């Protein structure tokens, strides 16, 4: 689910003035997005769920990890890195990747730490799920693959990771596509309470704060994840086969530890690592994103998410927002692969 939004929304709800200003910027961005300047009209049409597999996955050592990733398109094409969320995996992009490859992009789709066949190189490494650690993983992967610059695109955890990369390493990011917009938060912003109905939507983070929650997620991780899928995308009639393909990624031996630490860290209930302190300090200031960006939102997103006007002024470079209609929920790339791929191609042309 769009866990990243939790603390960001607390930050945005606390600033009504920001929302008013952002609304004006957001309208400008949306108009530009629909102005016909894009060069992606010839993307091949594809029905969601057309593809069910990637080519053989690859592995590479990168920083603290041995990363498992899918690859598509020409190796010398402009790079695109697609980043999944929780509880999802690389199959969120199984239809997006071939669309981008058909446009000549070199597409990399990694399993994040704690997912799929991605593994820590050392048993001594802290199983740390804090946001800056995940973003650092992707920079390390780019280094390992000798990718100097890429478009980064994602949703949920992946959207937040992409946002963080764009803030901390803008020189490595040619462009950004982020579902639900600006997802950068901090432990401090997480201390701000929300109205009761809003807090209710985050039931799972309070559950994860308990030992019972950790044990429950471990024991019922597939049932738990399927429930999140259903809540976050209430109009998406995914099949058991579709879910099972992704759910296999949650069998990673570090999965539960990473997920639980991620949420406990956000609530200030778990410590991070000192080596990320300076990065988190920079992120806590909620800096603007300067790289060219397109943000997306599904019209049936069942996960809590901010209104686009609440974050539009956090993008100071070329920017557009697009609402994706047709019953599209939280997992935009899997539910609306053409729209997601179009955003990537279009931001490349900004």
Language model: regions and residue ranges:
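N-terminal secretory signal peptides and thylakoid transit peptides that target proteins
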Residues: 2-20
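Boundary at the C-terminal end of the N-terminal hydrophobic targeting segment
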Residues: 31-33
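Flexible "cap/lid" subdomain of the alpha/beta-hydrolase fold that forms the substrate-access gate
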Residues: 38-56, 66-67, 72, 79, ...
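Short acidic-hydrophobic surface loop/beta-edge motif
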Residues: 58-62
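Conserved HGGG/HGGXW glycine-rich cap/lid loop of the alpha/beta-hydrolase fold
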Residues: 72-117
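Conserved acidic functional residues
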Residues: 85, 156, 334-335
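Catalytic histidine-centered segment of alpha/beta-hydrolase-like enzymes
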Residues: 328-336
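C-terminal alpha-helix
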Residues: 343-350
């Amino acid at each position: 689910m769009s866990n990243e939004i939790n603390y960001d929304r607390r930050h945005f709800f606390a600033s009504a003035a920001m929302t008013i200003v952002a609304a004006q910027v957001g309208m400008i961005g949306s108009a530009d997005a629909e102005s016909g300047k894009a060069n992606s009209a010839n993307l091949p049409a594809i029905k969601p769920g057309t593809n069910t597999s990637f080519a053989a996955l690859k592995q590479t050592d990168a920083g603290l990890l041995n990363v498992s990733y899918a690859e598509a398109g020409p190796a010398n094409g402009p790079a695109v890195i697609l980043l999944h969320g929780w509880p999802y995996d690389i199959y969120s992009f199984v239809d997006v990747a071939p669309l981008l490859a058909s446009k000549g992009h070199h597409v990399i789709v990694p399993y994040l730490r704690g997912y799929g066949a991605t593994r820590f190189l050392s048993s001594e490494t802290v199983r740390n799920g804090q946001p800056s650690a995940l973003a650092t993983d992707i920079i390390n992967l780019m280094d390992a693959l000798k990718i100097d610059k890429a478009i980064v695109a994602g949703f949920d955890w992946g959207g937040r990771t992409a946002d963080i990369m764009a803030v901390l390493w803008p020189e490595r990011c040619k462009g950004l596509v982020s579902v639900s917009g600006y997802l950068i938060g901090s432990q401090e912003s997480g201390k701000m309470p929300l109205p009761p109905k809003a807090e209710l939507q985050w039931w799972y983070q309070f559950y994860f704060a308990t030992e019972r929650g950790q044990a429950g997620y471990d024991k019922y991780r597939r049932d738990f994840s399927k429930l999140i899928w259903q809540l976050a995308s209430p109009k998406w009639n995914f099949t058991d086969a579709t879910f099972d393909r992704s759910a296999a990624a949650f069998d990673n031996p570090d999965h539960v530890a990473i997920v639980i630490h991620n949420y406990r860290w956000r609530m200030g209930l778990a410590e991070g690592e000192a080596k990320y302190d300076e990065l988190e300090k920079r992120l806590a200031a909620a800096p603007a994103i300067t790289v060219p960006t397109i943000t997306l939102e599904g019209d049936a997103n069942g996960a809590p998410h901010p209104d686009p006007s609440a974050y539009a002024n956090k993008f100071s470079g070329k920017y557009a927002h697009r609402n994706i209609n047709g019953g599209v929920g939280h997992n935009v790339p899997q539910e609306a692969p053409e729209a997601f791929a179009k955003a990537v191609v279009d931001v490349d042309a900004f």
